[in-house]
């Protein structure tokens, strides 16, 4: 019995009629396409038997090339040879230039601050470059399968934010592909290993690719893939190993000029070749820009040790989130070409206390998992019992009065998910409400991340608390968030889809979670104070309206007592003494009880005026 059933309209296959589906691993350094044939998932090679497609595009005035041919032009035409474009997806130009100052491209900003790459083919954005890579993969699949693809599953890093995921979807549409689903890369690896090896229990998926690192802690049980926790860094990967080694070679060779893009590309190519060679050898000779020398594995290990340690810190945080100790992990799945580095395997093995799994090619495992999922979603396995449960990394909620955050969906909730919560108006006659969508674990707005704002207008002008607004948060299977606010009596509604201009890094997410724990007691006190201040404001607002309407019901002495109580409440509400505010609210309530009773009696008399007892 399936917990999560995903189907696409019009894609249910007729008996004995298989639809053509593919899984695509759109990687930072390399990309792959895979499919299921004769019940087996396999990656599809090019004419020369190469399964990997370098994620590189070379642009010229009269066209472009993708893959190996493009990569061969990198040293001679650096500015027009775009690689690692995945790192730019969904980011602002300022963010890219701050994070990756070494990129040898000519950038220009679009009107909204997004990056445009100045090439011989004109100004291109990362979505267009990604689309050209996807087109090449789709063409390989169509030729190999002798037909057009009915749908694809494309993998993305677990920490891609909404803008990055939407950019990936846009690239696929630009490439003419029907996206069945975006799938987190670690989850795709879990699918591949779960089906092939049949393991049950807790599994860690350590995914170190060219440009991103993801760690996922999953529980596999009877076909259920449940992500217990995720962590990682969307700006850490094998590319960083390459750049550290390239800088080291530059120092050894005494190359001071950093402005020559050709030399920079040669250094990077030499570093990549050395890194690969050092996975098997203890020493490698390097010849670059007229310099010859040796690099040892020990030197390389010293360079990358701090980066590997960063990945293990993320592993520790993910295990803590999942409530799992390292010794509870049955298997560790290695994903991504960078996991071939001996130091990575050694340190990961030491951390988890077991030898990592490498049975499936770490370069291919994500594409294979995506192909298996695509085969199911396209309708070729309608009776599949496989379940797939992802989680959101940080809580989602709304700002409420007093600068408080009301969490609607807690972090590590499985997705897709929809949650609704009712809110009401604060003031009499309020006809609009500002919806401020927040992300984070703290209690106050100032300590959380703002995702989006929108307004609900057309609320009927009722007394405070009279209108009821239902706010619904919906996170789909791709991790995209939509928020809808609807006033119940009129049906008027407004909504927004959250598309941040750039995403959170691993360190920012970890910091937000850590701060929520460190400041837990302080946050609770701050929330209690804010709630009391909001209640004080509500009481004073209500009292002001009542006095304006019915002050004639009070004697001068009674009015003075109420005014004194209200003034005292207004004064203490400016301070930080929660108990004092609470007592002042109680005092106002005590002083106004008789006034409230008289107002109620007056309302009843007015309602009954002109009616007989029988009519009542």
Swiss-Prot record:
GO biological process entries: iron-sulfur cluster assembly
Single GO term (MF): unfolded protein binding
InterPro entries named among the record's database cross-references: ATPase_NBD, Heat_shock_70_CS, HscA_NBD, HSP70_C_sf, HSP70_peptide-bd_sf, Hsp_70_fam, ISC_FeS_clus_asmbl_HscA
Transmembrane segments: none
Cleavable signal peptide: none
Keywords assigned: ATP-binding, Chaperone, Nucleotide-binding
NAD in keyword set: no
CDD domains found in the cross-reference section: ASKHA_NBD_HSP70_HscA
Pfam family, one: HSP70
Keyword Nucleotide-binding attached: yes
Function: Chaperone involved in the maturation of iron-sulfur cluster-containing proteins. Has a low intrinsic ATPase activity which is markedly stimulated by HscB. Involved in the maturation of IscU.
Family indicated by similarity: Belongs to the heat shock protein 70 family.
Protein name according to UniProt: Chaperone protein HscA
Organism: Salmonella heidelberg (strain SL476)
Biological classification of the source: Bacteria, Pseudomonadati, Pseudomonadota, Gammaproteobacteria, Enterobacterales
């Amino acid at each position: 019995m399936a917990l999560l059933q995903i189907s696409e309209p019009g894609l249910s296959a007729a008996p004995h009629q298989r639809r053509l589906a593919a899984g695509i691993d759109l990687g930072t350094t390399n990309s792959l396409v895979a499919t299921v044939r004769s019940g087996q998932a396999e990656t599809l090679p090019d004419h020369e038997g190469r399964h990997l497609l370098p994620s590189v595009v070379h642009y010229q005035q009269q066209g472009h090339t993708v893959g190996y041919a493009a990569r061969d032009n990198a040293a001679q035409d650096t500015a027009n040879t775009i690689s690692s474009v995945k790192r730019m997806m969904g980011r602002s130009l300022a963010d890219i230039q701050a994070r990756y100052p070494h990129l040898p491209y000519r950038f220009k900003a679009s009107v909204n601050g997004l990056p445009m790459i100045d090439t011989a083919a004109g100004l291109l954005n990362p979505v267009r470059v990604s689309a050209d890579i996807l087109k090449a993969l789709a063409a390989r699949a169509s030729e190999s399968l002798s037909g057009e693809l009915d749908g694809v599953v494309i993998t993305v890093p677990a920490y891609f934010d909404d803008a990055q995921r939407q950019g990936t979807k846009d690239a696929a549409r630009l490439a003419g592909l029907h996206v069945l689903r975006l799938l987190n890369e670690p989850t795709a690896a879990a699918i591949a290993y779960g089906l092939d090896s049949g393991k049950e229990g807790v599994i860690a998926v350590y995914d170190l690719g060219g440009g991103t690192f993801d760690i996922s802690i999953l529980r596999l049980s009877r076909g259920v893939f449940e992500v217990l926790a995720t962590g990682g860094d969307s700006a850490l990967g094998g590319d960083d190993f390459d750049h550290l080694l390239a800088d080291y070679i530059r120092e050894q060779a005494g190359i001071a000029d950093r402005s020559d893009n050709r030399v920079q590309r040669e250094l990077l190519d030499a570093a990549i070749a050395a890194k690969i060679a050092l996975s098997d050898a203890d020493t490698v000779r390097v010849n670059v820009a007229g310099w010859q020398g040796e690099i040892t594995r020990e030197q390389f290990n010293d360079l990358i040790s701090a980066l590997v340690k960063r990945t293990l810190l993320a592993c520790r945080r993910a295990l803590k989130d999942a409530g799992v100790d390292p010794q509870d992990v049955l298997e560790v799945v290695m994903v991504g070409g960078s996991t071939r580095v001996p130091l990575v395997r050694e340190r990961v093995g030491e951390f988890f206390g077991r030898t990592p799994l490498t049975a499936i090619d770490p370069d291919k495992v994500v594409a294979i998992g995506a192909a298996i999922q695509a085969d199911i979603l396209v309708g070729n396995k309608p009776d599949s019992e496989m379940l797939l449960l992802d989680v959101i990394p940080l809580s989602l909620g709304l700002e409420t009065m007093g600068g408080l955050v009301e969490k609607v969906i807690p972090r590590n909730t499985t997705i897709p998910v929809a949650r609704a919560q009712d809110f009401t108006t604060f003031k009499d006659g309020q006809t609009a409400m500002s919806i401020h969508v927040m992300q984070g674990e703290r209690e106050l707005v100032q300590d959380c991340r703002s995702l989006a704002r929108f307004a609900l207008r057309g609320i009927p002008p009722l007394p405070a608390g009279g209108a009821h607004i239902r706010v619904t948060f919906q996170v789909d299977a791709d991790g995209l968030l939509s928020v809808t606010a609807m006033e119940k009596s009129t049906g008027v509604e407004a909504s927004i889809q959250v598309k941040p201009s750039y995403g959170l890094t691993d360190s920012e997410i970890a910091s937000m979670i850590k701060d929520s724990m460190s400041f837990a007691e302080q946050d609770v006190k701050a929330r209690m104070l804010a709630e009391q201040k909001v209640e004080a404001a509500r009481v004073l607002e209500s009292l002001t309206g009542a006095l304006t309407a019915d002050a004639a019901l009070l004697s001068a002495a009674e009015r003075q007592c109420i005014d004194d109580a209200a003034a005292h409440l207004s004064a203490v509400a400016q301070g930080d003494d929660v108990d004092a505010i609470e007592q002042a609210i109680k005092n106002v309530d005590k002083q106004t009880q008789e006034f409230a009773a008289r107002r109620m009696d007056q309302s009843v008399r007015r309602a009954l005026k002109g009616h007989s007892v029988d009519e009542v």
